[in-house]
């Protein structure tokens, strides 16, 4: 989906969604393309969304139905040179529909070489003293976090795990 839309290694894809079935495939799909995932706090105001999308220099904003109003408020200002992809039913006119775009995508993994030292994600601080600050993570950092969580919870391959924290948070 993203590669067909011109997204390549080093590009940035902001994700503004509540925890949902599509969240993880989108997040890991972004990482597999070599692009950087930029998860956004679902509590952000329109101004904070605009600030973070611009600061991260996101090439794409993927957003869910809970954010139509907030994204619509800033769509004209942030859409120039940036893809807006909507995940949900009833796609707004200012965005592309995720379901339509993903309907004919290949299930084959992209042939993109990634290393532990490649940039992987940009997370944002809580912004308690002003606008949120961007924090760059390498693939090594994300893999290490996964290993720590797996060890901490003692998860096995076939376990079912209920994730309560928001997925935009590094601790989720």
Predicted regions and their residues:
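Conserved AMP-binding/adenylate-forming
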Residues: 1-44, 166
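Short acidic active-site motifs
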Residues: 47-48, 70
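Active-site charged/polar residues at nucleotide-handling catalytic sites that mediate phosphoryl
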Residues: 56-57
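ANL superfamily adenylate-forming
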Residues: 68-116
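Conserved pre-ATP/AMP-binding loop-to-beta segment of ANL
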Residues: 103-124, 131, 154-160
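Conserved structural elements of the adenylate-forming
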Residues: 121, 135-156, 161-168
């Amino acid at each position: 989906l993203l590669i067909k839309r011109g997204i390549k290694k080093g590009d940035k894809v902001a994700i503004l969604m509540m925890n949902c079935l599509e969240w993880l495939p989108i997040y890991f799909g972004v990482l597999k393309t070599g692009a950087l995932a930029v998860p956004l706090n679902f509590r952000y105001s329109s101004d904070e969304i605009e600030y973070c999308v611009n600061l991260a220099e996101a090439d794409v904003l993927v957003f869910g139905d809970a954010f139509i109003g907030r994204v619509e408020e800033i769509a004209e200002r942030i859409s120039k040179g940036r893809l807006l992809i909507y995940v949900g039913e009833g796609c707004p006119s200012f965005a592309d529909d995720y379901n339509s775009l993903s309907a004919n995508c290949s299930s084959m993994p992209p042939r993109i070489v990634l290393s532990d030292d490649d940039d992987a994600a940009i997370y944002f601080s809580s912004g308690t003293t002003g606008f949120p600050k961007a924090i760059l993570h390498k693939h090594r950092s994300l893999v290490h976090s996964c290993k720590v969580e797996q060890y901490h919870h003692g998860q096995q391959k076939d376990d079912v795990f209920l994730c309560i924290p928001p997925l935009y948070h590094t601790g989720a």
